From Swiss-Prot:
Family: Belongs to the TRAFAC class OBG-HflX-like GTPase superfamily. OBG GTPase family.
OBG-type G domain residues: 160-332
E.C. numbers: 3.6.5.-
The protein, known as: GTPase Obg
Xref: PROSITE patterns: G_OBG, GTP1_OBG, OBG
Listed cofactors: Mg(2+)
Enzyme class, UniProt record, top EC level: hydrolase
Gene name tied to this protein: obg
GO biological process, one term: ribosome biogenesis
Species in which this protein is naturally found: Vesicomyosocius okutanii subsp. Calyptogena okutanii (strain HA)
Binding site for Mg(2+): S173, T193
Localization per record: Cytoplasm
Length: 334
């Protein structure tokens, strides 16, 4: 399914049903009074959050959502049936905007949370409502009121506990395959990850959600590569996991690669750049065992990093169990 993280739709609530103009007509009653009933109310339109959804692609094909109208009233003071409300499901992490006023209507953060987007029209009044001591046979009624019509914008930011960072081919997809049941595409060329993806990591009957985005490259803030436009999907993450390939196949410098990511993060959003991070040094198995500690310490010194570090091999699983345990300990503490 195509990943879509923004959409615009037209929402039309239902119109209220018209009031009835009616008079009592029965045998032996020549001049019955008014008995026109009220109409029914128009249907509201709600958005509802669903945790099984992770894209707005549905709204590429359907852009109009219209609730039904209320039924008109009828004789014998019978009120028209009110219309059922329309509920439209959207992914968690979606912000709902009014495109005309730029008002933020609401934000989906919980499963089955509902947001009222457009109110249905109020019902029309039957002529019985207008009977009075001086007007015993009113012919006045009111039509149903129109429902609200709104142009709505949807902006999705995926909800995850952990956000993955790294240059293309740093090993993020391999890491996801190693510690979760997800099976992202892996290849020896950049940008095998083309859009944000979510995976669930389990440990001791607990679960956390990890988000991966396309790798970042230098000048991403100017539009280079694929990852920059997806950085917003890491904004909700509790912790960022920066994956560094210590022995890149393209011969690039891992120190420069790390600093490039940090620089592009700051250009995008200082608040995101200041999120708590863990450093994962990948492909540690390719280093001679006797030199591993020295090379890792040299890297940490060059990037001036003093936080928590995990040395792993995403290919064969070396160090991944310790990484998962550390992630759960950190996330569950927040």
């Amino acid at each position: 399914m195509k990943f879509v993280d923004s959409a615009s739709v037209r929402i039309e609530a239902g119109k209220g049903g018209a009031g009835c103009l009616g008079f009592r007509r029965e045998r032996y009653i020549s001049d019955g009074g008014p008995d026109g009933g009220d109409g029914g109310d128009g249907g509201h339109v709600y958005f509802q959050g669903q945790d099984g959804l992770n894209t707005l692609s549905e709204f590429c094909f359907k852009r109009l959502f219209r609730a039904k109208n209320g039924q008109p009233g009828s004789g014998q003071n019978k009120r028209g049936k009110s219309a059922q409300h329309l509920t439209v499901e959207i992914p968690l992490g979606t912000k709902v905007y009014d495109l005309v006023t730029d008002e933020l209507i609401g934000e989906m953060t919980k499963h089955e949370q509902t947001i009222l987007v457009a109110k249905g029209g109020f019902h029309g009044l039957g002529n019985t409502r207008f009977k009075s001591s001086i007007n015993r046979a009113p012919r006045e009624t009111t039509p149903g009121f129109p429902g609200e019509v709104r142009e709505i914008g949807l902006e999705l930011s995926v909800m995850a506990d952990i956000g993955l960072l790294g240059i293309p081919n740093a090993g993020k997809s391999s890491l996801i395959r190693q510690i979760s049941s997800a099976r992202p595409k892996i290849a020896d060329y950049p940008f095998t990850t083309l859009h944000p993806s979510l995976s669930v990591v389990s440990f001791c009957d607990k679960h956390i959600v990890m988000a991966d985005i396309p790798g970042l490259i230098e000048n991403a803030s100017k539009g280079a590569g694929l990852g920059f436009k997806f950085l917003k999907h890491l904004s909700r993450a509790k912790v960022l996991l920066h994956v560094v390939d210590i022995l890149p196949v393209d011969g690039s410098d891992p120190v420069k690669n790390f600093l490039t990511i940090e620089k592009e993060l700051k250009k995008y959003d200082q608040e995101l750049a200041n999120k708590e991070k863990l450093l994962v040094i990948n492909k540690i198995d390719l280093l001679p065992e006797k030199d591993r500690n020295t090379m890792v310490q040299s890297l940490l010194k060059d990037i001036c990093y003093k936080g928590k570090v995990f040395n792993i091999s995403a290919l064969n699983g070396l160090g991944c169990k310790d990484l998962v345990a550390g992630l759960f300990k950190l996330v569950l503490r927040k």
